[in-house]
Design a protein with these regions (language model features):
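Bacterial N-terminal signal peptides
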Residues: 28-36
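PDZ/PDZ-like domain segments forming the peptide/carboxylate-binding groove
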Residues: 93-94, 115, 129, 134-145, ...
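Bacterial N-terminal signal peptides that target proteins for export
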Residues: 8-9, 13-27
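Sec-exported extracytoplasmic/periplasmic mature domains
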Residues: 64-75, 88-100, 115-126, 134-152, ...
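Cleft-lining beta-strand/loop regions that shape enzyme active-site pockets
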Residues: 45-52, 70-80, 84, 218-225, ...
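Extended, domain-scale alpha-helical bundle/helix-rich regions
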Residues: 142-265, 274
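Conserved functional hotspot residues or short segments at active or partner-binding sites
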Residues: 198-211, 550-589
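Polar, glycine-rich mid-to-C-terminal structural blocks
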Residues: 505, 510-575
Length: 589
């Protein structure tokens, strides 16, 4: 995300933030790919409160104040009946995305709230959200009981022509409980068949599915009132744009840990995708990246500890529970059964063994190598220097203290360019594939290694003011032929750099169209106004600006289109900014 992070003790004295440390005393811009984060704040099992708390009622009003005010939100939206209907739809989708718990009769009853959720946010009277959730929890209990009972029935003979529609996003709600019974019978039979095709025996299948359904019920039973509140307020926040989010106090406390959690274990960021956990992003330098066997969109269906032994089915699990299984002691082994992104969910998974590790800074640093490319017709071979840059990193504290050896992507690339020049390479390829971004300053200064001063990016704020950020240093570190390699995982800072190189005609952009995220987010602490010693209200991440290329066009949605396109590795319709239904449109200034 291109995020301007902001905490209650900060001063407006800078414009970058570390991807390793989301909280910083600097007014910061974090240019990384979007990270989906909506998980239970802790593992508690206390009963769900019957009503929201007084602090939650106040927090809802504070969120409304931010998201409806053009001084804060880049694209404020009036909280009216139209937005209430959008919230209603999103809240139901967040609870029951596969339409497997609620009936059409339930929805007809909930429709009384359709035009009232805006009033609930404004007034802090949040009972409608809790009432809907109470019904949801009841329906989950009913379905879990029904599914477990089916496992002991003689329904697992597959000689007919039954069909089960796995993707239920566009199907209507089941008319009543009888229709849901039919749906769940098909679903359980499908789950059984998938395990049978994977080679499991009936007793093993029965045990696996019984545990899966029981875990699903327990997971929902453990949800707390703050989980309900966060999901409901996010139905409002996400209706504004896909990168606007609300975090409860506990979720906000864990927000800073979320990046480091992903950096231990296998080095991958995960997200929930229907009833499975999928890989959202591969962290450079980690076990997943080094294995070259995983990619964004791959789905994890089972986890095993050690090099051999039992594989634990994790379909239907909460994302935090799956993460807990994947993480472990550095040096230990973890096995994953993974269904590739391009395969159907019913496909046989691949077994991948990874050694858990913690990513070291040096493993994320820029690296170079020289490739010798044969030339035809008796011409001499070409020597091409390849620089791999996994992130636009910077040691912000070291830079602030003016340390001589602080970590910096630009400084490292400059050093590598000097070495490659000494090795008399004929051209340079800068590899930004799966580079999710990092520091805006680094993106600008890195561009300056290849151009002799000039604008690099334009930033338009919510009030319409446009600032131009550019390279002011004279001199070029590399004047020879340049190519920049990108793919769908190249986002934000990578897109700023690649776009500038393309706009200046300084080099060729090759690969795939990039991610397409061209917005700026700000993390606002809701406790900064009451100046609470203990957090009570949480935080809001909201979009406050949009960035534009030197040529005036945005990277939003469209991304950076390569001059020379390679066959795509990830379906653009499944991954990227354009997959969000309410992403900001492309525009230019």
């Amino acid at each position: 995300m291109l995020d301007r992070l902001h905490t209650k003790d900060q001063a407006a004295c800078g414009r970058e933030a570390s991807a390793m440390n989301a909280k910083t005393p600097l007014l910061a811009l974090l240019l990384t790919a979007p990270l989906a984060l909506l998980a239970r704040a802790d593992g508690g099992t206390s009963a769900l409160p019957n009503a929201p708390t007084a602090d939650q009622a106040l927090a809802a009003k504070y969120v409304y104040g931010l998201l409806s005010d053009s001084r804060y939100a880049y694209r404020p939206r009036a909280l009216d009946d139209a937005l209430s209907q959008d919230m209603y739809k999103r809240y139901l989708e967040s609870l029951d995305p596969a339409k497997q718990f609620f009936t059409a009769q339930d929805i007809a009853r909930f429709d009384a709230y359709k035009n009232k959720l805006d009033d609930a946010i404004k007034s802090g009277e949040l009972d409608p959200a809790y009432a809907i959730f109470a019904t949801f929890q009841q329906r989950v209990n009913e379905r879990v009981k029904f599914a477990r009972a089916l496992l002991n029935q003689d329904i697992f003979v597959f000689t007919g022509t039954d069909r089960y529609e796995y993707d239920r996003e566009d199907v209507p709600w089941s008319a009543d409980n009888a229709a849901l019974d039919t749906l769940w019978k098909q679903s359980v039979r499908n789950d059984w068949l998938r395990l049978k095709l994977a080679g499991k025996k009936p007793d093993e299948i029965r045990k696996t599915l019984d545990k899966r359904y029981n875990n699903m019920g327990k997971g929902f039973a453990e949800l707390k009132g703050e989980d309900v509140f966060q999901a409901f307020v996010n139905s409002y926040a996400n209706a504004i744009d896909p990168h606007t989010d609300y975090f409860t106090p506990r979720a906000a406390e864990n927000f800073n840990q979320s990046m480091s959690l992903s950096l231990e274990g296998i080095g991958a960021q995960l997200q929930k995708q229907d009833d499975v956990v999928a890989i959202r992003e591969i962290i450079p330098g980690g076990p997943a990246s080094r294995s070259n066997k995983l990619q964004p969109g791959d789905r994890i269906v089972a986890v095993g500890q050690g090099e051999s032994g039992v594989m634990e089915d994790v379909i239907g699990w909460r994302i935090d529970d799956v993460v807990a299984k994947i993480r472990g002691t550095k040096g230990s082994k973890v096995r994953l059964d993974v269904v590739p992104v391009e395969a159907g969910i019913d496909s046989k998974p691949n077994r991948i063994v990874l050694t858990r590790d913690k990513i070291k800074l040096e493993e994320q640093a820029a690296k170079s190598k020289v490739l010798t490319i044969p030339a035809g017709n008796g011409a001499p071979a070409k020597r091409i220097g390849v620089i791999e840059l996994p992130g636009f990193y910077q040691d912000f504290e070291g830079r602030r203290k003016n340390a001589d050896d602080y970590a910096s992507a630009t400084r490292d690339v400059s050093r590598l360019l000097t070495q490659l020049t000494a090795q008399k390479v004929d051209g340079v390829v800068l590899d930004l594939r799966n580079n999710g971004g990092g520091s805006l300053t680094e993106a600008i200064e890195l561009t300056g290694l290849f151009i002799d001063r000039g604008p690099v990016v334009q930033v338009r704020e919510s009030g319409g003011r446009v600032s131009v950020e550019g390279d002011s240093d004279t001199g070029i570190a590399w004047e020879g032929p340049l190519a920049v390699l990108i793919n769908r995982g190249s986002a934000s800072a990578s897109e700023i750099f690649a776009g500038a190189i393309q706009d200046y005609g300084r080099g060729l952009i090759i690969g795939e169209t990039s991610f397409g995220k061209g917005t700026v987010q700000n993390l606002v602490d809701l406790d900064r106004w009451p100046a609470n010693e203990e957090p009570r209200f949480g935080q809001v991440k909201l979009t406050i600006a949009q960035f534009f290329r030197v040529s005036g066009g945005s990277t939003q949605n469209k991304g950076v289109v390569p001059d020379i396109a390679f066959p795509v590795s990830v379906d653009a319709s499944e991954y990227g900014e354009s997959t969000y239904d309410n992403a900001l449109p492309w525009t230019r200034i």
